[in-house]
């Protein structure tokens, strides 16, 4: 009966008559019918919603009539009571009537019906969510199959693995737990930061497995890293590819810096690359959230070759510019095929920097003489050399970008966000600046890698050949 009335009502809606009168009259009639049915159902008449007979086990009765306590009601009775208490929203009624999206029930009818939106289902608690994921297989070591050993360090071993859930390859970073010390602080940092970073140019943390003996981080698997890529192409990259990798590096770093996160350990070994050419920041073990009150950090960060001079001289107060110096060093290395400042000690590293960029003075670097290490070493007075003489394959824009990153005064270094808008990347087009955070640069058909001049026949080193990759992941 109710379905017939609904059809009649919908048919009246479709008539070509003045809209306001038709809506109000039809709704008035429907409202009255709806209220009657709703009241009759609440009076325990055996009539289900929209004219359907209710299931026998769901018949309604008072708890006191059955002699049961309210807390002892059967599931069927509890279900029916919940149904009696339900209120319908405007959206519910509109869906039942299949009204067009541009038609809304007038407010006065909603008030008359006292229709309130039903409570939305509450989100799962953290404990419930963990239990649900555990049922699927997440958080369990047996979900993953270890394949090849990729590397081993003081605290961790990295394996190539496979997920039984998805059949996808993964990287398993197994961190050994010492009962006296617990999980290393680097592992805690890496987990706490990566679980909140969702970007196409940042490695994805898929799962976390905690046992008595180990903490295993499950990452997406990428075939190679930038160091291995350079080795395989004979340290002679296409300048177009240099630009694409550089843009991806800056894109991922800008995302981190916008969230006040410093990577602090940028180097080619920590920039992973898959077969598609997607570059992703990895190894956040030394990363730091800068939102903490203090500005003092350890200066024992960043591999020596990519460490900025202010940190080499002992500065512990730094911000996002610490990463930008490393970006400049990596840019140079991709363009030339050799590291920019390959020093073996802090003093030698500073000597190489000063010999290329000129020995700093109070005029070129205010406050440099305040560093005791600078006064102690007594460096010769070098004059700056033109960068184009050392990186001749870079064009004018590339040299300008490089020089904007390799500045002594940290606050003067170009930021990652500003670097993305540099004219050096103009040839990539405008659409690369409009991508969503999780969208790959290669989702644009105009972005493709070119064959490198030093190409050796395979894009990446095959598993099992040469040294294990990602030695720097520790």
UniProtKB/Swiss-Prot annotation:
Q: Which reaction does it catalyse?
A: L-seryl-[protein] + ATP = O-phospho-L-seryl-[protein] + ADP + H(+); L-threonyl-[protein] + ATP = O-phospho-L-threonyl-[protein] + ADP + H(+)
One GO BP annotation of this record? positive regulation of myelination
Q: Name one GO cellular component term.
A: mitochondrion
Q: Which residues bind ATP?
A: 150-158, 173
InterPro entries hit by this protein: CDK, Kinase-like_dom_sf, Prot_kinase_dom, Protein_kinase_ATP_BS, Ser/Thr_kinase_AS
Q: Identify which top EC class this enzyme belongs to.
A: transferase
Which GO terms fall under molecular function for this chain's record? ATP binding; cyclin-dependent protein serine/threonine kinase activity; protein serine kinase activity
Q: In the record, which positions carry Phosphoserine?
A: 14, 74, 89, 98, 117, 132, 440, 443
The protein's superkingdom reads: Eukaryota
Tissue expr:
Isoform 2 expression is limited to several subcortical nuclei of the basal gangli and the spinal cord. Isoform 1 is widely expressed.
Question: Which E.C. number(s) belong to this protein?
Answer: 2.7.11.22
* PROSITE patterns linked: PROTEIN_KINASE_ATP, PROTEIN_KINASE_DOM, PROTEIN_KINASE_ST
Give every Protein kinase domain span: 144-425
What positions constitute the catalytic site?
Answer: 265
Database matches in Pfam families: Pkinase (PF00069)
Check the record and name the Gene3D superfamilies matching this protein: Phosphorylase Kinase, domain 1, Transferase(Phosphotransferase) domain 1
Keywords, A to Z? ATP-binding, Kinase, Nucleotide-binding, Phosphoprotein, Serine/threonine-protein kinase, Transferase
Q: Which pairs of Cys residues are joined through disulfide bonds in the record?
A: none
> Which residue ranges are recorded for the region named Disordered?
44-93
The family line of this record is: Belongs to the protein kinase superfamily. CMGC Ser/Thr protein kinase family. CDC2/CDKX subfamily.
What biological function has been recorded for the protein in this entry? May play a role in signal transduction cascades in terminally differentiated cells.
Recorded protein name is: Cyclin-dependent kinase 18
